[in-house]
Amino acid sequence: MINKIDLPSAQPEEVRKEIEDVIGLDASYAPCVSAKTGLNIQDVLEAIVEKIPAPEGDPDAGTQVLISTIDYNEYVGRIGVGKVDNGTIRVNQDVVICNHHNPDKIIKTKVSKLYEFDGLNKVEVKEAGIGSIVAISGISELHIGDTICSPENVVPIPFQKISEPTIAMQFMVNDSPLAGQEGKFVTSRHLRDRLFRELNTDVSLRVEETDSPDRFKVSGRGELHLSVLIENMRREGFEFAVSKAEVLYHTDENGKKLEPMELAYIDVPNEFAGAVIEKLGQRKGELRNMGSISGGTYTRLEFSIPARGLIGYRGEFMTDTKGNGILNTVFDDYGPYKGDIQYRKMGSLIAFESGESITYGLYNAQERGTLFIGPGEKVYSGMVIGQTGRSEDIEINVCKKKQLTNTRSSSADEALRLTPPRILSLEQALDFIDTDELLEVTPTNLRIRKKILDPTLRKRAMINKKA
């Protein structure tokens, strides 16, 4: 099925050819549809009936169910979801679990509850046969890729290995001066329980405890993967802080450093192609292919680029292409380390004093760069309140009030015009933070801050780093 043909840049015939060339599948029959508008959906339903074969298997053979996803419920625990490939599965049936991660580990257990799906709802059943998509609860040791077998037929089903994490972030308890004021769950126990609970449903996530009980290393398959987790936790009422993403390196048999490489597929209007090529070149990207699409108005670029080269780039990409570019990435392989990358060339505007931002103070600050906050917002010393136009950080007092005299009155502040602040989204904030900064995440606010809040200690740390 080829979706989104309602878009101006849609090229269904080119996509058919790419599917055949890259994947090797015959795409000549693939329906061209628009899920958004409902165009040609009837063709999809007819193709399902015509092209997809009925389930095959031996109903008299031993039970075989391959677990393809994991759900979680606080009342019943882990719920394994998979398709019955052979035999039948029944409630209270004795079964054996073939562990995908440890083939020598065989677990004997019993099916306590069995469900089939009716739309988005689970319906409890007594048994299910070949082709049924079932949910099985009561087995705490289930993992994606495991096979549930009958004891007399312990034969695991081959499973595609899930790709390993490529980047990591530090999740930590928020210790800023505003900590605990906006979140419902703020302690290290809350944070730990939530992160380890996520492992029940997200098999590509890794959570490790560190030498500090208030800090956890969380690894995932990219910035987007971890940003979804952060946003979900934020909406649930959690308050915490995260560090800048860092790449997970490997070493080869000769001890040489290897880094994760991504394939980036980019569609941009022709006038922006040069800027994109330049930026990705600075980030150690290698242009592999370039062509014209959409009747010659768009350029398609294919890059091989280190995963760390994409950290913080999506925001720049949308700015450089004025929102008209499309960027898709996929993990390729581990390759030789490409060398150092200069991530951010602009410094931060840092609040010098704690308090409430004042129009007068912000008016003076906006001459130094782009502001992230407006008047009347809580700030603290060491909090990043904007971006400078230069490479170094600048400390500034946005809580500063104008001294009143007989000829100066507070009403004169009304004549000061502030440029509207740049409000960062979660993805933009994660892109912006530098290695010496943290992102403070609460249900109501996103604040960027320096890891070391005290200006004297921060300067001393910078001197020691350069020494």
What annotation goes with each model-predicted range?
Residues K4-S9, A35-N40, D71-E74, N86-I89, ...:
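Conserved nucleotide-binding/hydrolysis micro-motifs of P-loop NTPases
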Residues I19, D146-C149, K217, E223-E239, ...:
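Charge-rich, low-aromatic oligomerization/scaffolding segments with amphipathic character
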Residues D85-P213, R235:
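Catalytic P-loop NTP-binding/switch module of NTPases
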Residues F117, K122-V125, L258, I305, ...:
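Long insertion/accessory domains within large nucleic-acid-processing enzymes
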